């Protein structure tokens, strides 16, 4: 990875702290040639637009196999690729691999059928002078998929399809808004708040 990324030269051999994993939700492509393979719902491929520190996710597509993978690239994008051109917009979406139109009715139907999943786009680590963006890591993704939260909110979301859109996509409870790994992290943070409170009370005695 570092060979193609001059910005990583100073980090070779170091262990960096992960501060975030970036994911995209996915649904089966509506294109028959994709045979139900999942494609991402992405508003933008940008990771950072800061001048001199531009970074974005570049999709490497193999149309013959109906597959894709994500690479993190830095600097200004090459002509022909616009990171602002995601796969989902107000008017609908498109299949990342084939370009086939993917309307919201299709996305909603897949969500309601429990077919909405996630795919890792990038890993964010703490660098010497700010954030550093790395390619997706299969081992990290595998660990995230094994997460089992000790608790999750079972309360139902408001049923108001006009103003509250998430139930339209199969997300009916507050727990549905988060992935298992996110719920695990939130429960951990909540537990730590309780421990901190107990520590403060103990120190006040």
Label for each model-derived stretch:
Residues 1-205:
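Charged, often flexible domain-edge or linker segments that flank or initiate folded functional domains
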């Amino acid at each position: 990875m570092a060979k193609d990324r001059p910005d990583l030269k100073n980090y070779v051999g170091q262990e960096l702290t992960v501060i975030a994993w970036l994911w995209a939700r996915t649904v089966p492509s509506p294109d028959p040639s994709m045979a139900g393979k999942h494609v991402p719902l992405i508003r933008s491929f940008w990771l950072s637009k800061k001048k001199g520190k531009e970074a974005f996710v570049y999709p490497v597509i193999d149309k013959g196999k109906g597959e894709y993978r994500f690479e993190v690239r830095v600097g200004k994008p090459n002509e022909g690729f616009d990171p602002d051109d995601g796969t989902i917009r107000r008017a609908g979406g498109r299949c990342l691999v084939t370009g086939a139109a993917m309307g919201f009715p299709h996305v909603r139907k897949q969500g309601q059928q429990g077919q909405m999943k996630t795919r890792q786009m990038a890993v964010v680590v703490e660098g010497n002078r700010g954030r550093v963006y790395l390619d997706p890591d299969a081992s990290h993704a595998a660990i995230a998929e094994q997460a089992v939260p000790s608790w999750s909110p079972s309360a139902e979301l408001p049923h108001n399809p006009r103003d509250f859109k998430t139930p339209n996509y199969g997300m009916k409870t507050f727990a549905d808004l988060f992935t298992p790994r996110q719920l695990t992290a939130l429960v951990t943070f909540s537990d730590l708040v309780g421990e901190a409170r107990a520590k403060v009370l103990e120190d006040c005695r």
